[in-house]
Design a protein with these regions (language model features):
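Low-complexity, Ser/Thr/Pro/Gly-enriched N-terminal "stalk/linker" regions
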Residues: 223-325, 347-391, 425-426, 430-453, ...
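Extracellular ligand-binding/catalytic regions of CAZymes and related secreted enzymes
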Residues: 25-27, 37, 69, 97, ...
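An acidic, glycine-rich "communication" segment
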Residues: 95-170
């Protein structure tokens, strides 16, 4: 089934039972609340009887009919059931579908337990070709009842794979989810399957065949039409729907509004919740209450949403204050301030940068001491002892510093403020003096070894690190810094590192989650190198990387992920079922999976293509950027029931099925995660630049950071001589 056909079917009004004009209806009786997803879908035609309790439903059901005893108390309470009730059903020859039961005849049910790594896997052939054996589904927020039941149709198990459990089912810890009871005429779900809309079970298109099987079992011999419904969280447009002429400004406005609707801006009234969140595993917990006020940036901004979806369809939030996310997001607010004339958002942009550089631990302490080796650097996050005895603000990722600075550059230009110029240049120089002779800084530095070794140890080293994910955006900021200061080490070291990296491409490159993200990251420094030195060689470097990246751009505009050579990556797909969910990971299992990644690749490709187009005026980049802009406008989240998600972009999108779906193997940032910085900030910012018909390079052309160069070089490079 094509994505276009599937999408049209999912957006039909909820219809299931035979049309009212037909004399025949399905003989179904419900014991469920009137708000149950399945009941509401079936009841659209008024063809299904409903009662409040299992006992009443069994008593009122016509002989030989199908009765659905649904789990209204889920997940706190199991569905009340007993022997006499089943005896009455048997005497009436009823066929029962029973969810989350309190008791089963002849089978011992364990206490309810929650899934952690387990996903739902098709374990039989009852669903036919629509859902073949070992197909993977997601029951979000699943709590189930362990039971020993043979021949289950669906099971919960920890498995690796994108769509299919590629290593099969594990030898143990496989839990029945849907099975026919040995006594017959009783189909049991050990969890609640009927909240498939509310809890956003995925892929949405897979749950139609599940229900068709269940209802066919309940009504043998009857023709069961396909189940269709509107997902509660869905893409804004289908793959073939005509986009509005103003779709870009709509996407921009909704994307910036999302920060406020999701309560990402911390407000003083609930600031204490940040401290309370440290008790959550990995500081991931329930989202801010929608009734709480949205902040103004002065208390910082949360990292974003975790990929964990709860049984009510809400998602957990990452309660971290991260330098990169805040700096990047400040640009989004600043663009809104200019484009929409929104003074509150301009203020938020300024406040976020003030928080980073003046009012938080991120740039204070050793980072504010000129005698310290970490002087000028910005810490990764504000959490003390975030990992064992290591403080989050004592961790220095170069790429995170770089992206935060890029956001500050944009915000300063849009706000026409020199307020952060000195701090910005100080951070640029701090990163430069921890970059080696050859132009490589390495993946990250930590406070303790940095203080022990001193900055000169790194400045005079000859490390090599062919990892654009970690290196490329610092190179871009260094090229920008050279343009505005003329300080030669910014250019010389960077140009050398880029030359070495291009000579090493692709065989010696080290990839993080995939090869496409490394290519996407290289676009920005290569485009800005053309700005500084427009040579045939530099244009050829840019074209080579872009051509290889765009070789995997789908007709829809999506950029497909690709895993790099074995042995050259950090976070590849899990190689065993047991490895699933234990580390950061790519969201595909093998090359060819139709997945685009909006956290690591697509977002940075959008920015890189935009800057490449502006630098070269070549159609290759402009046309690819336009295709990507249309695609991103289509897949932006739309949801009336979850305003905290409306206007966002999830990390993963499966562009053939046109759904939010992936392997979700990443331990921290899975398929449904939303990052305020990396993703939301850059997608809205590029849309903003397209509205203003400018580029990041041109937008920031009037920066006055050079005014602070001489004093800072004397302070930070004492004893060093430069040609």
């Amino acid at each position: 089934m094509t994505a276009a056909v599937l999408w049209k079917r999912l957006l039909l009004a909820a219809v299931f039972c035979a049309a009212p004009a037909r004399p025949e209806t399905l003989p179904l009786v419900f014991a469920a609340s009137p708000g149950n997803d399945l009941y509401r879908t079936l009841a659209a035609t008024g063809a299904c009887a409903r009662y409040d309790s299992p006992a009443e439903a069994v008593a009122k059901a016509p002989a030989g009919s199908g009765v659905l005893l649904l789990a209204d108390g889920y997940p706190e309470r199991t569905t009340p059931i007993d022997g006499p009730l089943l005896d009455r059903a048997a005497r009436k020859r009823l066929r029962l579908y029973l969810e989350y039961p309190a008791w089963l005849p002849g089978l011992e049910l364990g206490a309810p337990r929650a899934t952690r790594w387990e996903r739902t896997v098709v374990s039989s052939g009852v669903f036919g070709p629509a859902l073949e054996r070992l197909r993977i589904l997601a029951i979000h927020g699943c709590r189930f009842l362990p039971v020993a039941a043979p021949n289950a149709d669906l099971v919960a198990a920890r498995v690796a794979g994108f769509d299919t459990a590629v290593y099969g089912l594990p030898p143990k810890d496989v839990y029945p989810i849907l099975f026919e009871h040995p006594n017959g005429r009783l189909l049991v779900a050990t969890t609640k399957l009927s909240q498939f809309i509310t809890a956003r079970y995925a892929p949405a298109g897979a749950w139609g065949p599940v229900w068709k099987h269940i209802l066919t079992w309940l009504c043998p011999g009857r023709k069961i039409p396909d189940l269709v419904w509107t997902p509660s969280v869905r893409p804004s447009y289908s793959p073939t729907e005509k986009l509005p002429l103003d779709y870009e400004i709509q996407a921009f406005r909704r994307g910036v509004r999302w920060f406020e609707n999701a309560r990402m801006l911390v407000h003083p009234a609930w600031k204490r919740s940040l401290d309370d969140a440290r008790k959550y595993p990995d500081q991931v917990g329930p989202m801010p209450d929608p009734s709480w006020p949205s902040g103004d940036g002065s208390e910082g901004l949360l990292e974003g949403f975790s990929s964990t979806i709860r049984h009510d369809g809400s998602q957990l939030v990452r309660w971290w204050l991260r330098n990169d996310c805040m700096g990047e997001s400040s640009a989004s607010f600043a663009f809104s301030g200019v484009i929409e004339g929104n003074r509150d958002r301009s203020k938020a942009a300024a406040n976020l940068n003030d928080f980073i550089y003046f009012h938080s631990v991120l740039a204070s302490g050793s980072r504010a001491d000129p005698r310290s080796a970490s002087f000028g650097l910005a810490g990764w996050n504000t959490t003390p002892k975030y990992y064992q005895e290591m403080d989050g603000f004592g961790v220095y990722y170069g790429d995170d510093n770089a992206r935060s600075m890029l956001g500050t550059m944009a915000a300063a230009a849009l706000l026409q403020s020199p307020r952060w110029d000195e701090m910005l240049l100080r951070c640029l120089l701090a990163n430069l003096r921890t970059t080696g002779r050859l132009g490589f800084r390495g993946n990250r530095l930590d406070e303790a070894p940095l203080q022990k070794n001193g900055w000169r140890h790194y400045f005079h080293s000859e490390r090599i690190n062919y990892a654009p994910h970690y290196e490329a955006y610092l190179w871009a900021t260094f090229l920008w810094a050279y343009e505005h200061t003329g300080f030669r080490p910014f250019l010389d070291r960077t140009r050398n590192a880029i030359r070495m990296t291009m000579a090493a491409y692709p065989d010696e490159w080290h990839w993080t989650n995939g090869m496409q993200q490394e290519r996407a990251r290289m676009l920005l420094p290569l485009a800005w190198l053309v700005r500084l030195e427009d040579t045939a060689e530099h244009r050829a470097w840019l074209r080579r990387i872009a051509t290889d990246l765009l070789a995997l751009q789908d007709a829809s505009g999506a950029i497909r992920e690709e895993i790099g050579p074995a042995g050259k990556g950090d976070y590849g797909p899990p190689q065993t079922n047991e490895a699933y969910g234990t580390n950061e990971a790519t969201l595909i299992q093998r090359n060819g999976d139709p997945l685009c990644d909006l956290l690591y690749t697509t977002n940075f490709a959008f920015l890189g293509l935009h800057e490449a187009s502006a630098a070269t005026r070549e159609s290759l980049y402009a046309e690819a950027e336009d295709r990507l802009a249309r695609f991103l406008g289509r897949i932006q989240v739309r949801s009336q029931s979850h305003p905290e998600l409306d206007g966002a972009w999830f990390r993963a999108f499966e562009f053939k099925r046109w759904e939010y779906w992936a392997s979700n193997a990443d331990a921290g940032w899975g398929a449904w995660s939303i990052e305020t910085g990396w993703t939301q900030a850059w997608l809205t910012s590029v849309y903003g630049m397209r509205q203003l018909k400018t580029s990041l390079w041109d937008l920031t052309k009037d920066s006055q950071v050079h005014r602070h160069l001489d004093n800072l070089v004397r302070l930070m490079f004492e004893g060093e001589r430069f040609e």
